[in-house]
A protein has these predicted regions:
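Residues that define the transmembrane beta-barrel architecture of outer-membrane proteins
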Residues: 11-17, 40, 46-51, 58, ...
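Residues on the lipid-exposed face of transmembrane beta-strands in outer-membrane beta-barrel proteins
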Residues: 19-23, 53-57, 66, 93-99, ...
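Transmembrane beta-strands of outer-membrane beta-barrel pores
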Residues: 25-29, 36-40, 59-61, 68-72, ...
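Extracellular/periplasmic loop regions
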Residues: 158-188, 199, 205, 211-213, ...
């Protein structure tokens, strides 16, 4: 896990052991982390539980990951706008390309590409119990020192959510930019069935050995109308810019990370 992995800070002294175990079966790897409370704090309600349990490996031309583990998107491992190592592990299924491929036609110019799709179900103690997250991510490497990513995330379903037809659900995932969803829907009913995010990120490695990496990301929460750009890039957006400096004092295990983040007041709140 990266960061706290969603672990709560308890009042008073507490101690938890987290033994982990990993093994391989053929081309598949499996991993498990169990939390065992030894000394509980004054506010603790923690009991023995599974923090992470998952397996991953190739399935034909695809690569699959199944189980509970932290989902990290983008170059900021601990502070991503949508997924990060600070959050509790999600029960999920992720399917992606096993290795890189080239897109056809002029899109070949964006270089080696990876595509992944993930489906997660949130727990019953969330704001919208038992809802679903479906994420789409495309990574490309147009130059040797530059990596870019495009992403979309759809949060829908769960207790209390509005009902919708199968076609509306499918179209809701195919079109993630809000203004376009009005095509063919005069009453804009589909806008009420989910919350959608779209964004991009990059990582630029300076062209020498053990050089710093400069990175950033921009994510929007439900894009608005063209005449609302001040709201789109202000209240509805989340920005991250940072620099990662590896090999401090020649030690591979020491590094520094400088990061700035700003999130609009409507982000996560739609």
């Amino acid at each position: 896990s990266q960061g706290r992995g969603g672990r709560r800070i308890e009042e008073g002294f507490s101690m938890v052991a987290e033994p982990s175990m990993g093994f391989a079966v053929g081309d598949w790897d499996f991993y498990k982390v169990v939390a065992i409370p030894i000394d509980k704090g004054q506010s603790s309600s923690q009991s023995v539980g599974i923090e992470e349990i998952w397996g991953e490996g190739p399935v034909g031309p695809l690569y699959m990951s199944v189980g509970r583990h932290p989902n990290v998107w983008g170059p900021s491992l601990k502070n991503g706008s949508l997924f990060s190592g600070q959050a509790r592990g999600l029960d999920q299924i992720t399917v992606g390309s096993d290795g890189t491929f080239r897109l056809p036609w002029i899109l070949e110019k964006i270089g080696p590409t990876r595509l992944s799709v993930s489906l997660s179900r949130l727990e019953k103690d969330r704001n919208i119990p038992n809802s679903y997250l479906v994420g789409y991510r495309l990574n490309a490497k147009p130059w040797r020192s530059l990596e870019v990513g495009l992403l979309a995330l759809v949060h829908s379903g769960g207790e209390g959510s509005p009902s919708a037809s199968v076609w509306s659900r499918v179209l809701d995932h195919l079109i993630v930019v809000e203004p376009l969803t009005r095509l063919g829907t005069p009453e804009r009913q589909r806008l009420a069935i989910s919350n959608r995010f779209a964004g991009l990120d990059f990582r630029w490695r300076l062209p020498w050995e053990t050089a710093p990496q400069i990175y950033g990301s921009l994510v929007f929460d439900d894009l608005g109308k063209p005449d609302q750009l001040d709201r789109v890039f202000g209240q509805d957006a989340s920005y991250i810019v940072g620099m990662f400096v590896p090999h401090i004092l020649g030690n591979d295990s020491q590094y520094m990370r400088f990061e700035y983040r700003e999130t609009g007041i409507r982000f996560y709140a739609h």
